[in-house]
Each structure stands twice: as C-alpha cells, then as structure tokens.
C-alpha cells in the first residue's frame, strides 16, 4: 500500500504523462505545481524518458495560454488550478476545445469567492466551465 494525498497522486500522473506543465500557484492546487517543478528540477523523467518542461507563469490566464501554445506545437501539456484561477482560463478553454486539442486541466474544486474570500470546497468553479466544450471527468473522492 502507498500512502499519498490527492495532490501528490495527481501531480505524479501529470508529470509522467506530460511534456509541458504550465503552473501558477493557487490554493488548494499549489502543491501539484510545486511537486512537478521539484521533480523536473531534479531531472525526473516522464514515461518517455524526457524531463517535462515546467513553466511558471504570471497568472492563471498565462498558464492556460502556455498550455494552448504548447498543444499547438504538438506537445503533451497540462496545468493545475482551482476557483478564480479556473475562471481566468475559460477563454483559452474555448479555443483549446474548439481546436480539438488534447489536454488535462487538473482542478482542485473550490468555491468561487464572491463577496468574501472563501477556501471551501464545492463545484462552482468547475460548473462555470460546462459550456467550454471540455470533457469533464470527476472523482467522487481523493482515492478515486
């Protein structure tokens, strides 16, 4: 048995199956970006024996744009986000889905803050993306 948390499990799969990982820290998905950055910094290879390129951007919108650009060039790319960060990625999500480019946005679902800061978990951020054309695969628990 391997003991791990959801962020570590998600980061492991993303690092092994990607060539480009665009990151920008936002709670609660920050540990995923930190882990893949550390692993690439230590030259840990993906499944194809190459070290994924990790690019930290100035915003979530920049991370989504980086993923879009990498996909356009034929790279396997992914990112990590939640809450308001996911909302900033929506314009690029429409383009990525419309161009039928394969990617994964790993989302740690969190309440979209309205009148006050909120760190509670719900699916309001994910539900805001329903019309983008992205296929959504969701787990019922961290273990799944």
List each model region and its residues.
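Thiamine diphosphate
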Residues: 1-128
